[in-house]
Structures are given as C-alpha cells and as structure tokens.
C-alpha cells in the first residue's frame, strides 16, 4: 500500500459502518464510503465535531446536513499544490486525495525526463477538477486537460491558478 503522506490539510480521522470522517483544512466532514464495511465506536469525540454530514437519498443523490456554516469553497494543500474544495450534491468535494500517490509517481517520472531536456506532454482525459493536471504541470509537463463538464474545467482552471 502506498500512502499519500504529503497532505498538509487532509486526513482521515476515522471510519466506520460505511462512513468516513475526514478533515479538509479546518472542516470536518462525514461522507459515505461503501468500502468501509466494519463497525467501530462512533462515540469518539471526533465524530461529534463534524461540520457537515452527507446523507444519501434512496432515490439517488443526497444532501449535506451542516452543523456549522461551511464556506462555499476553501483550499487544501498537498505538498506545493493547492486545491479548492467545494462540497457537492453527490458527496464529492472536488478532489480524490487518495490519488496523490499517483501524482507523486508521475511527477517523479516527469521531473526525471524534463531534467534530461526532454519535453513531456500529458493528455489528461476525464480530468475532473484537475488534481492530476495541476500535479503534472507543476512537475514540468505540458498538459492538455479534457473533461466534458464545463463546470469541472472551470474548477480545474481555478485549481491551476491556486498552484
């Protein structure tokens, strides 16, 4: 297992019974995760400090129940990369933090090649909000970011500007 240990503003605090307790910056969120099939004691203090919990709807989608006022967006940092976080109506925050190990891997490859004078071009398809795009560009690659959703492309541009 590879760990993305460069997060400055993200951590999984706990997980139990299909839910993940995460801290994104200074906001604690509870989100569903079908991979979490075990049960542990949710009476720990961290669970009581959640700023928001995402509840799935039986008809699809879901909604956030907020216990404190969440900003529309805020930033988190992974190493020297910055990303905007926005809780959306389908549990996502705009970033898959577990992908950071992949960003590290290809960043090492890109840096090694560009240091030897080679130009690296990356085509990032289904690129979402640009986590991989930003990481590849920061490592020295020329990146073509492609996503069918205009809103995601705009968000990726925001993330690129942050980094």
What residues fall within each predicted segment?
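Non-catalytic substrate-recognition/targeting regions of SAM-dependent transferases
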Residues: 7-22, 29-97, 104
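Structural motif
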Residues: 27-28, 142
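Short, surface-exposed loop and linker segments with low hydrophobicity and enrichment for Pro/Ser/Thr
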Residues: 21-24, 122
């Amino acid at each position: 297992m590879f760990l993305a240990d460069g997060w400055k503003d993200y951590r999984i605090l706990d997980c139990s019974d299909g839910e993940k307790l995460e801290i994104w910056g200074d906001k604690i969120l509870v989100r569903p995760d079908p991979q979490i099939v075990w049960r542990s004691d949710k009476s720990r203090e961290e669970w009581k400090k959640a700023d928001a919990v995402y509840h799935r709807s039986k008809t699809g989608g879901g909604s956030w129940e907020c216990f404190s006022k969440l900003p529309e967006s805020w930033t988190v940092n992974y190493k020297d990369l910055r990303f905007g976080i926005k809780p959306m109506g389908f549990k996502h925050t705009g970033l898959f933090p577990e992908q950071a190990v992949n960003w590290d891997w290809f960043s090492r490859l890109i840096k090694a090649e560009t240091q030897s004078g080679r130009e690296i071009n990356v085509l990032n398809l289904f690129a979402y909000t640009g986590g991989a795009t930003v990481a590849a560009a920061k490592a020295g690659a020329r990146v073509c970011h492609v996503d069918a959703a205009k809103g995601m492309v705009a968000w990726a541009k925001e993330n690129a500007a942050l980094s």
